[in-house]
């Protein structure tokens, strides 16, 4: 190899340049700059220097080396290997090697010692008995060794093996000390194209280890060996004490105490203070039993310190059947506790809720707020179209089927003031959604079409508004149509106790047209006038409080809740508690889709960051910290579960009979997924109402969001119909549905779902059959036939007699036989049918007692199409 610079050599060797310069100077070579050239001779000098330093390090090895080894094994404890218990055993061994030069050669000076006579072999434990007993108390491994001979009689083989092992282990211990030099040497060997022989380590055989057990002890032990003494067993007092503590169970110890040994002060004090005995109670114990809203029978028995069977006996004597894990309500628990002679103490579990109200910061600054107006009315009467004209948007055109199917919240700024509108669905299935809209509003605008009049949902909207004690403003829409009749609308509304101001009532009526914009300004004036009368005010500087209008699961943003703030100000970063869910507000989105930092009273916003989808209608409130929010949310979830369990039907005879009847009916299982919580609730209620005594609809799973693989698996397992309302299935769910031949039904209009499920239920109804008489024949005479038997010669007096149809034989208007018409002939010819006014011969199958004057009634069974 050509001469290289110091820098290049350092790169080849793999060490820093400064370190290589120091090593060159230590080797006696004058190198001060990394650009100086190094020839082959100088490389060899450096290599020899590094080899010498490595050997010096090895020669400076310590006189004593300790090796530690660890082995793992398993032992089955028990009589049977299949039923026994498997125990993991870890054995740790420790070996100490000493240089021969460190051991004083006393064997040559001392007189030879005669080996002691040993009658039986000595079992010697491993050197690390104390370590094993202290660290692995389960089992202790022992080895059997031959009788230990004096050190003077050790043969040369053992000495040679010891020397080899000592050198090997010495080399191992010096690996780290000479690691740097070794790396440099190996790299330099590659550079100068020389090889350094590397000795391979050999594993120590178990036989060698067992022969040198006596050399693993200290110098004192070796001197005792030379005197002919046996190696003692190393059970020190400290290790015995540790082992005794680890193995003790129930006060038992592996090592017995000597008799007469006095007990320690700890045990003496325990014996003096603890006295075992039973004192018979002289009077009945009356306990104060804390009773929450719901409690299980087992927990109630535990609080009274009695067995659950006694509580069940008392409940049965009171006429209520219960099981040990059944949840009973507070009233029943009080009766049972009083019956058993204890004192019930009713506790209110809403302490957490009360504490929440106290923890919420209340503001003091009160300002006027915009009115919250809910637009209600019958479907297709123009609610969304009116709102579109006010907002100058086209929401209705983009809605499926042209109908609203979830609540929309909008904040509108008009020249006359700000107004918050809630647009509710008008379909009959959205009753609960309209009720929520009425509860969260200040004014209700009742839309009635001038050409259609008052409809069922119009009446329902009036009832919701009256229940919420909210003023109503009637807007008579579609006044631009030629057949508009506002007087008819006023007459029909007066029947529902909605009297216009023109007739002496207190309800404002405004004629409008959402299409042309006629009367819209008058309607806005009426809204603002009504809001001034109400004097709407709200606190603006406290913790925000509002109501969840709608909620849904967004694929990219997670749970999204539309919250209408009613008081306070909701800020980004607040901890929001909504029903059973909570979370930190990550973002606030206005009704226009813009990100905002805060929202004041009467402002609807979409909230991102909740843990899950809250229920529409839940109260939303800002809490001081996340710990409080989690505590209240978990409490509400637990209470909801307990109440749900307590509402389970009690085991009664009537309930058993109803359940038996229910098992006979057919069930249509449905897995339902929708885009928002309100639509999900409305569809589920509408489908459940389709159930009858014969067929039932059971929504076994419902959720907000797309159709997933787990939904398809559930539909397969339960043989259910999979319905997606304004949602789609992901790729995995689609592939699984195709493989398992599961059809996924997509809908965007609630009418279509109801119609198709109604059709499916109709097909599940048991068929209904009706018997229709198609012909009557009068027997005039009877003939005998050798093949068939009696043949009735008849005259068809009504309808048509057909062959192979079921018949009845009537005598004096009493049915005497029911069978099948086997043979039908006319003039010795077989015919299929004979009409009224013709004669024929009729042979009745398996019946020969036909007499003149009898009537043969021919009928057929017709299936009647059933409907729900």
Swiss-Prot record:
Its main location: cytoplasm. Residues 249-260 have a biased composition (Basic residues). It is found in: Cytoplasm. Residues 402-406 are annotated as: G2. It comes from the Bacteria. Residues 377-384 are annotated as: G1. The keyword Secreted does not apply. Residues 513-515 are annotated as: G5. CDD domains: IF2_eIF5B, IF2_mtIF2_II, mtIF2_IVc. Residues 477-480 are annotated as: G4. InterPro entries: DNA-bd_dom_put_sf (IPR009061), EF-G-like_DII (IPR053905), EFTu-like_2 (IPR004161), IF2_assoc_dom_bac (IPR013575), IF2_II (IPR044145), IF2_N (IPR006847), P-loop_NTPase (IPR027417), Small_GTP-bd (IPR005225). GTP binds at residues 377-384, 423-427, 477-480. One of its GO terms (cellular component) is cytosol. One of its GO terms (molecular function) is translation initiation factor activity. Residues 423-426 are annotated as: G3. Residues 368-537 form the tr-type G domain. Keywords: Cytoplasm, GTP-binding, Initiation factor, Nucleotide-binding, Protein biosynthesis. Residues 201-269 are annotated as: Disordered. NCBIfam families: IF-2 (TIGR00487), small_GTP (TIGR00231). Belongs to the TRAFAC class translation factor GTPase superfamily. Classic translation factor GTPase family. IF-2 subfamily. HAMAP family: IF_2_B. One of the essential components for the initiation of protein synthesis. Protects formylmethionyl-tRNA from spontaneous hydrolysis and promotes its binding to the 30S ribosomal subunits. Also involved in the hydrolysis of GTP during the formation of the 70S ribosomal complex. This is Translation initiation factor IF-2.
